[in-house]
Amino acid sequence: MARFPTSPAPNLLLRLFSSNKRASSPTAALLTGDFHLIRHFSAGTAARAVKDEKEPWWKESMDKLRNIGISAHIDSGKTTLTERVLFYTGRIHEIHEVRGRDGVGAKMDSMDLEREKGITIQSAATYCTWKDYKVNIIDTPGHVDFTIEVERALRVLDGAILVLCSVGGVQSQSITVDRQMRRYEVPRVAFINKLDRMGADPWKVLNQARAKLRHHSAAVQVPIGLEENFQGLIDLIHVKAYFFHGSSGENVVAGDIPADMEGLVGDKRRELIETVSEVDDVLAEKFLNDEPVSAAELEEAIRRATIAQKFVPVFMGSAFKNKGVQPLLDGVVSFLPSPNEVNNYALDQNNNEERVTLTGSPDGPLVALAFKLEEGRFGQLTYLRVYEGVIKKGDFIINVNTGKRIKVPRLVRMHSNDMEDIQEAHAGQIVAVFGIECASGDTFTDGSVKYTMTSMNVPEPVMSLAVQPVSKDSGGQFSKALNRFQKEDPTFRVGLDPESGQTIISGMGELHLDIYVERMRREYKVDATVGKPRVNFRETITQRAEFDYLHKKQSGGAGQYGRVTGYVEPLPPGSKEKFEFENMIVGQAIPSGFIPAIEKGFKEAANSGSLIGHPVENLRIVLTDGASHAVDSSELAFKMAAIYAFRLCYTAARPVILEPVMLVELKVPTEFQGTVAGDINKRKGIIVGNDQEGDDSVITANVPLNNMFGYSTSLRSMTQGKGEFTMEYKEHSAVSNEVQAQLVNAYSASKATE
């Protein structure tokens, strides 16, 4: 009996087939060829080349390290999966479920709100050991409103597990997190979860991953039974069945493949070899020559293709039923890269941001990235990924972004909301530091180099709320809470409405903002009144317009004089920058000292367009000429000239209003499809996809966010409570002429009543 221990233990040896003994069946012979293999099942050592004895000591240490994330669509079971991983690796000694059914809640959901709602809000970090491998795990949120947590996790990880639901399949947030993995070039394995659920269909989900995610993927396992008959898994690489015994599935028993499944196993292993050979030359040669492929050769090929991001191996199981988690852990260490197998780059600020390859050596200069901030019990907690060098408790380090020199007072390794003090951390490790003032995305070095890591992609907020404390005595705590939330979360913004004087909070959706209002009440004892959610419209221009404005004030005392000439034009579609300013003045028509004031004036004017008072974006301003006065010109005069010049030419540039458009995915019983589709059309949505999944219709549509308020209630009413939907931000696009006229009239009316 093969047994997976719940704590680090010597590698398990399994003798699978022998060259001097025939395979147990014709199918097994076809699948495996004749070979003799003793496998270290947990470590995947068959995939390792013989190491050079002269390799530095730290490379061997890093070979045994994995930095992985677990990402998925909401409610796909990723926190449940992480709970099992922690149990089987000996990190926790009993399993607790999501939603705190047992009064405790999952270990990685450390916030009370997370345990009550059964969702992950923040990304929790933990460290565990699987056999002789050290694994850092980030458990990330699945709800689209918390997508920045996923971005921050993937930025610093070397590999990831994409969890897919065997019933729900590839859903909208599955597509989003997969796109984020591509952006940060993160190799991944997929885990099709919930095979015990009614309607489980892993092969449908695999085909969806190939079609919707464009995954070049194949299953490395076949389930033995589905739904209530799900019993175990067949490993297609080693052609062996595994069953999960014990009260928590901790005993993994190797057995024979059921006779009625040999045909399916043969087909699926052949499909696996063929799929991998399409992206791996070594395996392709054996496949084309019709040579038998051993388990070791197949495992090596899968590892090469996965690390090169050419292949996604697909594992299966049911985390809730404690089946399939240990083989998935073996897949993590076998197929996902160690830190020294990933190319990481920094930008040298002393050399025009030239790309510098980071070796990962602890002997090199310290380079570390702050990827998450959190207010802990003992002050601000900063999560760091060390890319090169060593960071030690008591060291002085430099924040390259601010130039500040900071001492490291305390260094810890995180385990959800618990921590362990450590003395030092080497390249490749993820740790947390207390008492460092910085922003998310800042780079730290030891001062010998001036490197920065590329910044993380931070999406713009799409929704705002007016919020104010019920009691005036709560003002101090109210401000303290908002300041903390802003530092922790780059997508949470706080501003002041200049007209009403109200505090405005902005974020990625209703749930995102509701969570922060609730956290304010719980953590800071501040009750707040909340206004109606408002969409974050924007404005832009559609054509070039000239400006020539003279700001002149010379009626006694110090005068003001400044003239600016040039033009405004829209930026090309897809531009990264939202605002560009270019000074093309030849000569000294305007002294160079006044140019920054002119740019500041245009930026200030663009903060509030004249249509509905929202920010103007995708705008390029070119200054071509101007005039100054020897006595009366000043920074203020030129700033005012720029503000008035922008306002005067804005109408001539044919401005339009942009609104956030959401990608909405609905899953409804087929009998309600017509009603739901008709309602989407009434909301000015455009249906872009309509698929059938069993008795359900899956509708994909682009719908203006402004028309989606209260949609949950409407959908429940239309589908007798059987419909569900998700939505995520897609883009800002121009509103229709009719809607623009309505918005402009409403804005003008509100201004008139002030």
Curated annotation (Swiss-Prot):
Q: In which pathway does it act?
A: Protein biosynthesis; polypeptide chain elongation
User: Could you say which protein family the record assigns here?
Assistant: Belongs to the TRAFAC class translation factor GTPase superfamily. Classic translation factor GTPase family. EF-G/EF-2 subfamily.
What does the entry list as the binding residues for GTP? Answer: 72-79, 139-143, 193-196
**Cellular component GO terms, alphabetical:** mitochondrion
Biological process per Gene Ontology, one example term: mitochondrial translational elongation
- Main location (coarse class): mitochondrion
Does the keyword Mitochondrion feature in the UniProt annotation? yes
- Residue span(s) of domain tr-type G: 63-340
> What SUPFAM superfamilies does the record tag this protein with?
EF-G C-terminal domain-like, P-loop containing nucleoside triphosphate hydrolases, Ribosomal protein S5 domain 2-like, Translation proteins
Q: Which gene encodes it?
A: MEFG2
Keyword annotations of the record = Elongation factor, GTP-binding, Mitochondrion, Nucleotide-binding, Protein biosynthesis
Protein name per its UniProtKB record: Elongation factor G-2, mitochondrial
What's the stated role of this polypeptide?
Mitochondrial GTPase that catalyzes the GTP-dependent ribosomal translocation step during translation elongation. During this step, the ribosome changes from the pre-translocational (PRE) to the post-translocational (POST) state as the newly formed A-site-bound peptidyl-tRNA and P-site-bound deacylated tRNA move to the P and E sites, respectively. Catalyzes the coordinated movement of the two tRNA molecules, the mRNA and conformational changes in the ribosome.
Top-rank taxon: Eukaryota
Q: Which InterPro entries match?
A: EFG_II, EFG_III, EFG_III/V, EFG_IV, EFG_V, EFG_V-like, EFTu-like_2, G_TR_CS
Tissue/organ expression: Expressed in cotyledons and adult leaves at the same levels.
Molecular functions per Gene Ontology: GTP binding; GTPase activity; translation elongation factor activity
The extra comment attached to this record reads: This protein may be expected to contain an N-terminal transit peptide but none has been predicted.
Q: Where in the cell is it found?
A: Mitochondrion
